[in-house]
């Protein structure tokens, strides 16, 4: 059984209550695929937008924060399932205050004192890995699981190479 919380809001995230072997659990998972006319803060600026599943945006961070708070209120343990490439970046993302929303979510997770479990299916990248129940940002995490294909990193290789060598390549 699964009862979704705020369907349609923050469509990159699926949140809801599930019964697993008779035990009620809060489930948070990210959606893979294209998200038409989303995120809303890019729609307001450009009149069109296309979000990418696996990336976190404003509404999804707000939705997760509210859901963690509700689970904490009712002492419902949580299961996090992630396959993420990170939190949206750029000027629009900064104006949408994504960093602050991520910090608020980590605070909610830490103060909830709920038992949690996290599963990384393919990728757990950067701050998105932490806010999706990753053990680095979660003292309540009982354990984390991965698959043979799981990659967890602070920054993907291409981004790291660009950050390290862009200035040097421009000089040469």
Identify the residue ranges that each predicted region occupies:
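Ligand-binding clefts of soluble mixed alpha/beta catalytic domains
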Residues: 1-172
